[in-house]
UniProtKB/Swiss-Prot annotation:
RNaseP catalyzes the removal of the 5'-leader sequence from pre-tRNA to produce the mature 5'-terminus. It can also cleave other RNA substrates such as 4.5S RNA. The protein component plays an auxiliary but essential role in vivo by binding to the 5'-leader sequence and broadening the substrate specificity of the ribozyme. It comes from Streptomyces avermitilis (strain ATCC 31267 / DSM 46492 / JCM 5070 / NBRC 14893 / NCIMB 12804 / NRRL 8165 / MA-4680). GO terms for molecular function: 3'-tRNA processing endoribonuclease activity; ribonuclease P activity; tRNA binding. The gene is rnpA. InterPro entries: Ribosomal_Su5_D2-typ_SF (IPR020568), Ribsml_uS5_D2-typ_fold_subgr (IPR014721), RNase_P (IPR000100), RNase_P_CS (IPR020539). Keywords: Endonuclease, Hydrolase, Nuclease, RNA-binding, tRNA processing. This is Ribonuclease P protein component.
Length: 123
């Protein structure tokens, strides 16, 4: 489970990540990343935590399928939060094919999207 301090909950935070962040699309999901704008040399300020949120619409499937996809994505992001810059906002939007995908396929798409957003992958 994703720790509480790493969860994105407010509508404004989702909107900021989607509108002002960078986007990487994959066959099963789209990842929006708004990098943290913190100054590492600012005195007395600790880095805010990276926060992640998930959007899984009814196009993915029924309630059981949507919740299964959200649980899988939360589990995958838990291990990847440390790789992102402090203070970042991440929104993972599941596409309709995510409901039929297994854990490994979701992990592969999430890793590829994050790698592209962090500058490690070619277009």
């Amino acid at each position: 489970m994703l720790p509480t301090e790493n969860r994105l909950r407010r509508r404004e935070d989702f909107a900021t990540a989607v509108r002002r962040g960078r986007r990487a699309g994959r066959p099963l999901l789209v990842v929006h990343l708004r990098s943290g704008a913190t100054d590492p040399h600012a005195p007395g300020e600790s880095a805010p935590p990276t926060r992640a949120g998930f959007v899984v619409s009814k196009a993915v499937g029924g309630a059981v399928v949507r919740n299964k996809v959200k649980r899988r994505l939360r589990h995958l992001m838990r291990d990847r939060v440390a790789l992102l810059p402090p203070g970042s906002l991440v929104v993972v939007r599941a596409l309709p094919g995510a409901g039929d995908a297994d854990h490994a396929q979701l992990a592969q798409d999430l890793d590829a999207a994050l790698q592209r957003l962090l500058g490690g992958g070619a277009r």
